[in-house]
Amino acid sequence: MNFTNEIYDIIKKQPVNPNIGMLGSVGDGKSKCVQILTGFNPCTHSDEQIRNMTIKPGYRNLMICHKNKYYTIKKKTKNKEKEMENLVHHLSIIDCPGHQELIFIMLSSILLMKGAIVVVSAAEPLNQKPQLIQHLAAAKLANLPIILCHNKLDLVDKKIALKRKKELDEKLEEMGIVPKVIVPTCFSRGYGVENLLEQIVKHFPQTTVNDDDDILFMSNRSFDINKPGTNALELKPGIIGGSLLTGKLSIGDEIIVTPGIFGKNNKGELYYDPFHTKIDSIQSDKYSLRSIIPGGLMGLGTSVSPALCKN
């Protein structure tokens, strides 16, 4: 893939569309897929690590390179700047919780996605995966292109694997879903990863960017980064997390956050009060940026009170 020098300089630090959702039932291998692709465990919160499950949307940037074969730049990759010369794609992954009780958390992120990787374990029959059906239905309603990973094939014999594949094909046909490709995988052993990377580059390509449009940033998370017991004079403002959909956003820009503060007035009528704030910082993974174009998941440092940005 050939980039202009300007776009190449951008994608080295900022993911360019699309954002890819990681969907599927709980325990089927979504977070393991993210970890093996990026080198990072998306389950960063202590309660997630204790329960070994995704509770809040996990965000990780994925850098895909190509030199004789497809591979990724990870946390422990040596000579990262040298490997950057082989960069062909840079995108963000949204790891969504698969538990049935957390379906609304997944739905809050669906509009940020331009495509989805759906992970399905072959170790259990589909009738034990109601969350998978919900995720597939959401992806269909959002008209997302889908790459499907048939995972954990090392846990079943050939006969069972073929049976599970037939069940999957029948369910997809019943729902009217045609995935771009079905990739056989075993993420715990690293099988199928190179093929998956090739399919990501092929089916989720970089999109054309027009930064002259009006700014529209969609947020699905906010953060209070202050630790308990922090001195009031040392409190830092809140962080807004999400993705820029249109336009170009830079440090110093003023934005309007809607719906803002909402409640009911004396008449019992619902009201909302948008508030204005200024962008003080922009963070993409470990990179601090001065401006961003559409694509990728960002954290915006604002002047908003941290009390309004608590999870």
PLM features: what roles do these ranges have?
Residues 1-96:
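Conserved G1/Walker A P-loop phosphate-binding module
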Residues 12, 19-22, 155-158, 306-311:
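C-terminal effector modules of nucleic-acid-centric enzymes and ribosome-associated factors
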Residues 27, 33, 52, 95, ...:
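Residue-level signature of catalytic and energy-coupling elements of molecular machines
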Residues 27, 151, 186:
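Active-site glycine-centered loops adjacent to acidic/histidine catalytic or metal-binding residues
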Residues 33-37, 58-60, 105, 112, ...:
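Alpha-helical scaffold elements adjacent to nucleotide-binding pockets in ATP/GTP-utilizing enzyme cores
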Residues 88-92, 96-102, 111-136, 140-162:
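Conserved Switch II/interswitch segment of TRAFAC-class P-loop GTPases
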Residues 170-311:
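Conserved catalytic-core segments of large NTP-driven translation/proteostasis enzymes
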